[in-house]
Swiss-Prot record:
Keywords: Signal
Protein name stated in the entry: Uncharacterized protein AF_1659
Any Pfam family matching the protein: Peptidase_M73
Signal is among the record's keywords: yes
Native source species: Archaeoglobus fulgidus (strain ATCC 49558 / DSM 4304 / JCM 9628 / NBRC 100126 / VC-16)
Lineage: Archaea, Methanobacteriati, Methanobacteriota, Archaeoglobi, Archaeoglobales
Residues spanning the signal sequence: 1-24
Length: 250
């Protein structure tokens, strides 16, 4: 008996939390024949185990930015063909920037979201415009870095000084200033996403042990000085969703 299957593994990380991970396996048995499908397994962490990727409170326009790192690990038996990486965020008006006590419209409860991500609803493609808070969280630089056995083997800088690089404009990144505000920001990433990103090499001997293989997204973000008073106390949750595909994109 011949069998054919295509496996997909999806992991997601919120920029203010740490993802768990799981595995997919398929076992079939018939008579003396035994078939076991290889696993596809990815995990997401920061550069420090147990820490969030980005967690910023009481941020003010023009203040120094923040570094954020996301590591994508490949722990399965099947390396896979490529990664799809998408971005989304939820935007809430709030009075004090503290998500633990609920979302209450603050002293400047006038944020215009008519053409930007809907308050309290994950970002949906088609909500264009530079009125949402995500459009004011600027990307100074963004790298995709592949490490094999702790050695950097490839470094794609796709954003530098708020603008797409030649590498970022080309496939597979195809960056675009989607909201046409003159710089790259979180809203641009949510509108586009990435496909056909090479997966990291398999690392099946444990993480953070001196022989690590992973793909790292390294970014530096800051809060635009153009952000107005209407964002006082407001909160944006930014998520990264990673999918490992076994077969090439059509």
């Amino acid at each position: 008996m011949k069998t054919a299957a295509a496996f997909v593994f999806i992991a997601a990380i919120a920029m203010a939390t740490l993802s768990t991970y799981a595995y997919f396996a398929d076992v079939e048995e018939t008579g003396e024949n035994y078939f076991e499908a290889g696993t596809m397994d990815i995990g997401l962490t920061n550069d420090i185990p147990g820490h969030v990727a980005l967690d910023i409170y009481d941020w003010k326009p023009g203040e120094p930015g923040e570094d954020g790192k996301l590591r994508i690990w490949n722990w399965g038996e099947n390396k896979g063909d490529h990664l799809e990486i998408n971005f989304s965020f939820e935007y809430y008006e709030d009075d004090n920037g503290n998500a633990t006590d609920g979302f209450v419209a603050g002293p400047e409860s006038d944020s215009d979201v008519s053409q930007s991500p809907i308050i309290g609803v994950p970002y949906a493609t088609g909500h264009l415009g530079a009125n949402g808070m995500g459009a004011y969280i600027k990307l100074h630089h963004l790298h995709f870095k592949w490490y094999t056995n702790n050695a950097l083997v490839r470094d794609d800088k796709i954003i530098d000084n708020y603008q797409p690089t030649a590498t970022g404009l080309a496939a597979p990144y195809n960056l675009v200033d989607a909201n046409s505000n003159g710089y790259m920001d979180l809203e641009d990433l949510a509108m586009t996403g990435f496909d056909n990103i090479p997966p990291p090499e398999i690392d099946n001997d444990g993480w953070y042990n001196g022989t690590d293989s992973y793909l790292e997204l390294a970014m530096y973000i800051d809060f635009s000085t153009d952000a107005g008073n209407k964002y006082q106390g407001d909160i944006t949750f930014f998520d990264i969703i990673v999918k490992l595909e076994q077969v090439a994109s059509e």
